[in-house]
Curated annotation (Swiss-Prot):
It comes from the Bacteria. It catalyses: 2-(N(omega)-L-arginino)succinate = fumarate + L-arginine. It comes from Bacillus thuringiensis subsp. konkukian (strain 97-27). It is found in: Cytoplasm. It is an enzyme of class 4 (lyase). It holds the Pfam family ASL_C2. SUPFAM superfamilies: L-aspartase-like. GO terms for cellular component: cytosol. One of its GO terms (molecular function) is argininosuccinate lyase activity. Its main location: cytoplasm. This is Argininosuccinate lyase. Gene3D superfamilies: Fumarase/aspartase (C-terminal domain), Fumarase/aspartase (Central domain), Fumarase/aspartase (N-terminal domain). Pathway: Amino-acid biosynthesis; L-arginine biosynthesis; L-arginine from L-ornithine and carbamoyl phosphate: step 3/3. The keyword Amino-acid biosynthesis applies.
Length: 463
């Protein structure tokens, strides 16, 4: 077939060269954005008198037809037409005649593809924000059901201090809230229009870029045409934000995997989110959590891939930029899928409150309580720390826990110990007393939950 740009050329490319250079296999995902962008563009052309109203109306009718066909998956794309832009233009000309060739007046594929991706990411970022809020809603529900579920808090994967399971869950709520905030802030840079920047230098036609931007729902336009067509920082920012979100999901999945093991038994995954072994009939594997953990590396790879593509490109457009889309599409699909799976997995998991409770009665996670007890009686904390360290050593040598140590032994360590000491050794009491702002104390968790409910309600519609 003849190329829409073929006037300069006397030889046709080999079929395998065309296939190597074509992007239609993946950029057809931009079909809706491409057509909507074209409708806005031709509407502007008519307003400015660059095409007649009759020509614009005929072009818009053709584009609307193609849009409906696209929604029903009836469009047939060709490698020969290279990309989504030329495929749509070719179909339009076939549908309405040569007047369709006026659509591209005052426009380049360079600003056209950038516009498509801005429109695409604007929509997808909003979807991801909503899906993240839905996951946060699940976390709020689990936290509400586990305010007084006591578990070990860990540092270095060693039991450190008793905490509420709700407090642990809400830690991820706030991480996800920052992820949502980052996505929301990125919309300021996504929601601007490159349309009308042309190939790199603008156009001689009297276009109205602000009007096109308004028609497409953008908040403004790029101030520099070179910048508009050559940078992909808005995609990189999306990939970076998605990498951080996936990092948070991966960390949580790592804990879910540990907690579901026989060594912990803190939770049990629903059968819907686990698989078995082909050889070991007893196995129940947390495959979905493992896949989310693994797919995090995939999203990281997409970020570093595009960073590497961009690092050496001179202004303005270079064909290297064709490599900006597949990682973006893949990240959107991966993040949306992981958020959906994560929400279902957390909503259906069973919490073993008894096992969690046992874990904080058979350890030394209450040691800090004794140090605080002595400090509250006026002993410098460092001295209190030393005394409690010796008590823990004594217990490990005897094979007992701090609750088992007789008061007489405590008094040998310090005369400040009294019978009320044993009251502070209760894990429940230890959690309840940690009532500083943002702490694991039950009053603080209630306050955090109220604030969290308000935040998820902003998008999901709880209130």
């Amino acid at each position: 077939m003849s190329k829409l740009w073929g006037g300069r050329f006397t030889e046709e490319a080999e079929a395998w060269v065309e296939e190597f250079g074509a992007s239609i296999s993946f950029d057809q995902q931009l079909v809706n954005q491409d057509i909507n962008g074209s409708i806005a563009h031709v509407t502007m052309l008519a307003k400015q008198g660059i095409v007649t109203k009759e020509e614009a109306e005929k072009i818009k009718i053709g584009l609307q037809y193609l849009l409906e066909e696209a929604k029903q998956n009836k469009l047939h794309f060709s490698v020969e037409a290279e990309d989504i832009h030329l495929n749509i233009e070719k179909m339009l000309i076939e549908k309405i005649g040569e007047v369709g060739g006026k659509l591209h007046t005052g426009r380049s594929r360079n600003d056209q593809v950038a516009t498509d991706m801005h429109l695409y990411l604007k929509e997808k970022v909003e979807h991801i924000m909503k899906a993240t809020k839905q996951l946060q809603t699940v976390l709020v529900h689990q936290a509400e059901n586990n305010i007084e579920t006591i578990m070990p808090g860990y540092t270095h994967l060693q039991r450190a201090q008793p905490i509420s399971f709700a407090h642990h869950i809400l830690a991820y709520f706030w991480m996800l809230e920052r992820d949502v905030n980052r996505y929301e802030d990125s919309l300021k840079r996504i929601n601007i229009s490159p349309l009308g920047a042309g190939a790199l230098a603008g156009t001689t036609f009297p276009i109205d870029r602000e009007y096109s931007a308004e028609l497409l729902g953008f908040n403004g336009i790029y101030e520099n045409s070179l910048d508009a067509v050559s940078d992909r920082d808005f995609i990189l920012e999306f990939l970076s934000n998605s990498s951080m979100l996936m990092m948070h999901l991966s960390r949580f999945c790592e804990e879910l995997i540990l907690w579901s093991s026989q060594e912990f038994q803190f939770i049990e995954m629903s059968d819907q989110y686990a698989t078995g072994s082909s050889i070991m009939p007893q196995k129940k594997n947390p495959d979905m959590a493992e896949l989310i953990r693994g797919k995090t590396g995939r999203v990281y790879g997409n970020l570093f891939s595009l960073l590497t593509v961009m690092k050496g490109l001179p202004l303005a457009y270079n064909k290297d930029l064709q490599e900006d889309k597949e990682g973006m599409f893949d990240t959107v699909k991966t993040v949306e899928g992981c958020l959906h799976i994560m929400a279902g997995m957390l909503e259906t998991m069973t919490v073993n409150k008894e096992k969690m409770g046992q874990a904080v009665t058979q350890d030394f996670s209450n040691a800090t309580e004794i140090a605080d007890y002595l400090a509250n009686k006026g002993l410098p904390f460092r001295q209190a720390h030393e005394i409690v360290g010796k008590l823990v050593l004594h217990c490990t040598q005897k094979g007992i826990y701090l609750i088992d140590v007789p008061l007489a032994t405590y008094k040998e360590m310090s005369a400040l110990f009294e019978g009320d000491l044993y009251e502070v050794l209760s894990p429940y009491a230890a959690v309840k007393r940690r009532n500083s702002a943002g702490g694991t104390g039950f009053e603080q968790i209630e306050k955090a939950l109220e604030k969290a409910k308000g935040l998820v309600g902003e998008i999901v519609g709880i209130k």
